Amino acid sequence: CLATTDPNGNPTTGVTRTLSTKNSFNYNTESNDMKRNNTGGKDGWDPSKYLNIWVCDIASSGNTSVLGYAYLPGLQSWNAWKDGLVVDFQHFGTIGNASSSSDGRTPTHEIGHYLGLYHTFCESSGGGCCDNDNTWGSNVYDTPATDDVYYGSVNANTNNNTCNDLFYGFNSDLLDMDENYMAYSNHTWMFTYDQINEMNATLNGYRSSLKNSNVPVNCTGLVSNINIDNNVKVFPNPAKNSISIETSFSNYSINLKNILGKNILSHRNISYN
């Protein structure tokens, strides 16, 4: 969704374009300069009503490559003008000069942070295994513990298992969830239920003013809520060898896909009066 009215009440597409005095912004020394007019950037709009996203050329030192970054909710209450996302132009979407290495999903990852999510992999200074996105106070219990970062692609042959999840409250030892949007791997495509619940909790808490904003928006691609949770049951979850699916819908179509998105099983039920 993009705003259709700016803070002054004027019509807008939700996108502004700024001719900057800088060719790029150094992540180490200028990480917030793109957020101010007087430092070569663009002043953000009221962060209690808008989610500001600055798309620019992010420069970094050494071998570090920074695709984007965002502040967790509550961390910028004293400097609200900093709140929002910064995304390198090469990793925003998939059109034009955008890179395919992140599938254009860098904003998805950063919005996860903006809405209270941590990485799925362990970030403790001592290394080793940890259930990171639950360690730091969030209520995400359904992502397996993961030791360090996996930067590779995710496909049918990806079977990383860096931690024994039996030690972290799981009933079985699961593969690392490298396909999660909050991982650093390529070709990610999912949030878990607990991650979704955590983001909703943030929208009802720290970022409730954004959720309740009266700014008009133009939204496309939305899917109406048909209350899937109460009408479809998939168990066991997580599963290894087999799953069962139950539904109360009389008309339905089920497509089961593998990790590459290839359809491997289809079933349809249609009732006629």
Feature map (PLM): residue ranges:
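Terminal peptide-recognition signature
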Residues: I53, G112, M199
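Acidic glycine-/aspartate-rich tracts in secreted/extracellular proteins
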Residues: T4-P7, I58-S61, H91-G93, Y118-G127, ...
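C-terminal outer-membrane/trafficking sorting elements
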Residues: N227-N273
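Active-site-proximal segments of metallohydrolase catalytic domains
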Residues: C1-V86
